[in-house]
Each structure stands twice: as C-alpha cells, then as structure tokens.
C-alpha cells in the first residue's frame, strides 16, 4: 500500500520491486528453515529438526484422511513446501516494515495455477488422458454433453477460488488493521494483529488441505467409481 513504510521501500518504492522483494524473502526464509532442519540430522531430533518433523507429520496426518497414507507421503514435498512458503508470506503482514506478498493477486494466482496444472497432470499420468477426461462426463452417458462443460468450468473455477480466497483474506486483514492504526495507533490494533496471526495459520491450512482434496479427486478416480 502506498504511503506505508517498508524496509525494501528504502531501496525503491516501485510496487513491482516491493512485491518481488517480499516474495523472494518468503522463499529465502523457506529455504533457510529447510536447511537448518536438515543440517545435522539426528535420530532423536532437537531444535529446528524437531519442529520440522512435527510439521511434516502434521501435513501427512492432514492428507491421510483425504487421499490415503501412501499418496499423502507422495505429495508431501509439494504440499509442505507450499505451506511453508505461504505461511511466511502471510506472516509478513504482522511484522511492521514488511508487506505480505500473499496480499497480491499475482502471487496467489501463480500458486493456484501451480496446483491446478499439477493435479491435472497427476490425474492424466495416473489414469490416462481418455479415462481422466471421461470422468468429467459423469456416470450417465445421456447427460455427458451437459456434465462435461460443467465439470470444465468447475475445475477452472478452482483457480479463482484458491487465488481469491487467499488474496482476499490477507488483503482484507491488512486493510482492517491499517484502518485501526489510523484511528487509534496504540492499544486498539492489538486484537487486529491477533486476528492476522490466526488468519495467517488458517489460510495456509486451507490452501494445503484443498491441494490434497484436488489431488485426491484427480488420482483416485477408481475409488470414486466404486
């Protein structure tokens, strides 16, 4: 937002520069945490390794009920990396002097496209092109001309759903606290910061669980048809 101080804004106030800088910072933090967690692996984990193992076990447990144990572990690298990246991007809205890249539609749209392309790729790879797209037509052949375009629109709408949900919530929280700071810059904004912290966790979780849900719908066609 224009007029708000950011550390990167000292270098340049160009909006694109600020967005890209904060995005790379979120990516760098993700890499640093991953590096610290795997630097000295121990049988009995301590420190950052302990936190990371707990996080990864939580991600697998989250995916287990959606897609099964084996697939939850298979897609763990994608979902866990997205989770860390999005979380650090969201967290920047809480820290003064930083601007959350997830409050930019370009960021969230890019992530949504990654998920969309990947789950369709996995669905085609697992089931074959014909079988995968035949599933869009539904079980009743007579209704296939109606169901196929509806399913196509439904899948494309997932891009909008994923991207605008994350963007809207983070941007909305940002604007909400900004208004509170303008009205009363001391005690009043504190509940707003608590809300932003909760939202950072919640929106990360929602994006991760939906990624697992979309992957399950793409690769488990055989189970759905039973």
UniProtKB/Swiss-Prot annotation:
Reply yes or no: does the keyword Transport apply.
yes
User: Pfam families from the entry?
Assistant: ATP-synt_A
Q: Which chain regions cross the lipid bilayer? A: 17-37, 78-98, 104-124, 175-195, 201-221
Report how it sits in the membrane.
Multi-pass membrane protein
Q: Which UniProt keywords apply?
A: ATP synthesis, Cell inner membrane, Cell membrane, CF(0), Hydrogen ion transport, Ion transport, Membrane, Transmembrane, Transmembrane helix, Transport
According to its UniProt record, where is this protein mainly located? membrane
What compartments host this protein?
Answer: Cell inner membrane
Which SUPFAM superfamilies does the UniProt record give?
A: F1F0 ATP synthase subunit A (SSF81336)
GO CC terms for this protein? plasma membrane; proton-transporting ATP synthase complex
HAMAP family (UniProt xref): ATP_synth_a_bact
Relate the protein's function as given in its record.
Answer: Key component of the proton channel; it plays a direct role in the translocation of protons across the membrane.
Q: What is the official name of this protein in its record?
A: ATP synthase subunit a
Lineage of source species:
Bacteria, Pseudomonadati, Campylobacterota, Epsilonproteobacteria, Nautiliales
């Amino acid at each position: 937002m224009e007029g708000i101080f950011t550390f990167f804004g000292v270098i340049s106030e160009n909006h694109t520069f600020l967005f890209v800088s904060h995005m790379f910072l979120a990516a760098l933090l993700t890499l640093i945490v991953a590096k610290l967690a795997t630097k000295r692996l121990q049988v009995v984990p301590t420190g950052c390794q302990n936190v990371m193992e707990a996080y990864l076990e939580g991600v697998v447990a989250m995916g287990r009920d959606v897609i099964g144990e084996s697939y939850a572990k298979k897609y763990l690298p994608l979902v866990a990396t997205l989770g860390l990246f999005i979380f650090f991007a969201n967290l920047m809205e809480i820290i003064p002097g930083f601007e959350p890249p997830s409050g930019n539609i370009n960021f969230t749209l890019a992530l949504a496209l990654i998920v969309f392309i990947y789950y369709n790729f996995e669905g085609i790879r697992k089931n074959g092109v014909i079988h995968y797209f035949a599933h869009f037509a539904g079980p009743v052949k007579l209704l296939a001309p109606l169901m196929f375009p509806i399913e196509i629109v439904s899948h494309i709408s997932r891009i909008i759903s994923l991207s605008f949900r994350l963007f809207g919530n983070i941007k909305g929280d940002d604007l909400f606290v900004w208004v509170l700071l303008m009205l009363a810059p001391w005690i009043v904004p504190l509940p707003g910061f608590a809300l932003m912290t909760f939202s950072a966790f919640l929106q990360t979780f929602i994006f991760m669980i939906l990624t697992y849900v979309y992957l399950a719908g793409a690769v488990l066609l055989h189970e759905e048809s039973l």
